[in-house]
Curated annotation (Swiss-Prot):
An annotated Gene Ontology molecular function: antioxidant activity
Protein name (record): Peroxiredoxin
Purpose of the protein: Thiol-specific peroxidase that catalyzes the reduction of hydrogen peroxide and organic hydroperoxides to water and alcohols, respectively. Plays a role in cell protection against oxidative stress by detoxifying peroxides and as sensor of hydrogen peroxide-mediated signaling events.
Species in which this protein is naturally found: Ascaris suum (Pig roundworm)
Cellular component, GO, one term: cytosol
One Pfam family this sequence matches: AhpC-TSA
Length: 195
């Protein structure tokens, strides 16, 4: 059963990851005080997965400007991750990575986050936004054939950061600089009168 619930502490983990071409033990608690985007993908050496991982890695600078750490995870071993990173992109590999890739080869992290496809031993495409206090703020899970949007993930992080800082809420499709809503029956009318 999933331990991952919105508004509750994100399940803690410690695992081996490939970081800057080397093996390193990392824990979720290492990132306390920062927003974290944790995303799971099904398998190394597949087809949709490299498009997502490369996209998140190439946009990591935008996340870092927002104080956000990005972590990828699958049930493959750290050795498989490293081999995939060392495979050129033109051959379906990842090439240089700017984000840690976690090995969940005992499936515990995927199980705790509710994304383990038990019959195949792989993770669904789960994406989790965790705030600086370690609280889960957002969960999405895609079926295997459809990748996720880095742009939408950035937008969601920015929306949660705005809410945390200003106490106002963000309407559908909100982007930085757009109008927000003051929560309250009377206060919200100012937004609705404009829109």
């Amino acid at each position: 059963m999933s331990k991952a619930m919105i508004g509750k502490p994100a399940p803690e983990f410690t695992a081996t990851a490939v970081v800057d071409g080397d093996f390193k033990s990392i824990s979720l608690s290492d990132y306390k005080g920062k927003y974290v985007v944790l995303f799971f993908y099904p398998m190394d050496f597949t087809f949709v997965c490299p498009t997502e991982i490369i996209a998140f890695s190439e946009h990591v600078g935008e996340f870092k400007k927002l104080g956000v750490e990005v972590l990828a995870a699958s049930t493959d071993s750290q050795f498989s991750h490293l081999a995939w990173i060392n495979t050129p992109r033109k051959q379906g590999g990842l090439g240089e990575m700017k984000i840690p890739i976690i090995s969940d080869n005992n499936h515990q992290i995927s199980r705790d986050y509710g994304v383990l496809k038990e019959d195949d031993g792989i993770a669904y495409r789960g994406l989790f936004i965790i705030d600086p206090k370690g609280i889960l703020r957002q969960i999405t899970v895609n079926d295997l054939p459809v990748g996720r949007s880095v742009t939408e993930t950035l937008r969601l992080v920015q929306a949660f950061q705005f809410v945390d800082k200003h106490g106002e809420v963000c309407p559908a499709g909100w982007t930085p600089g757009a109008d927000t809503i003051k929560p309250g029956v009377k206060e919200s009318k100012a937004y609705f009168e404009k829109h």
